[in-house]
């Protein structure tokens, strides 16, 4: 038998992960594009700010629906769903960072920056990405620890 609330929560969380991944990818793409191809500041800010409220509004609606569905689940099922959410979010962000680095390499071939600038930008992307991924992995491990405690009880 399928738990209807668990299925709804799982699906909505996957949609939220997709929206977060799209938002991060679009922000990184705009920033990287503006570094290699000089664009006006107004255009840059418009590209950054235009999709953000729309995407985050949808993310908030999705999280609200998830919270509503999760009210009917057991504590174990809630932790299990959050565990899957954090795991999938980590993989999505990792894939986005790797795709960004690949894009930067291709842009560097076509429209080269100074080597020191390029190395600095790549280092910055790696440091920020490593920090976010590490934070998510720590959160994942905490959720796993809580799952073990709950399953023992």
Curated annotation (Swiss-Prot):
<dbReference type="GO" id="GO:0005886">
    <property type="term" value="C:plasma membrane"/>
</dbReference>
<dbReference type="InterPro" id="IPR035582">
    <property type="entry name" value="DUF5418"/>
</dbReference>
<keyword id="KW-0812">Transmembrane</keyword>
<keyword id="KW-0472">Membrane</keyword>
<keyword id="KW-1133">Transmembrane helix</keyword>
<protein>
    <recommendedName>
        <fullName>Uncharacterized protein MJ0587</fullName>
    </recommendedName>
</protein>
<dbReference type="Pfam" id="PF17439">
    <property type="entry name" value="DUF5418"/>
</dbReference>
<feature type="transmembrane region" description="Helical">
    <location>
        <begin position="17"/>
        <end position="37"/>
    </location>
</feature>
<feature type="transmembrane region" description="Helical">
    <location>
        <begin position="44"/>
        <end position="64"/>
    </location>
</feature>
<keyword id="KW-1003">Cell membrane</keyword>
<comment type="similarity">
    <text>To M.jannaschii MJ0129 and MJ0554.</text>
</comment>
<feature type="transmembrane region" description="Helical">
    <location>
        <begin position="118"/>
        <end position="138"/>
    </location>
</feature>
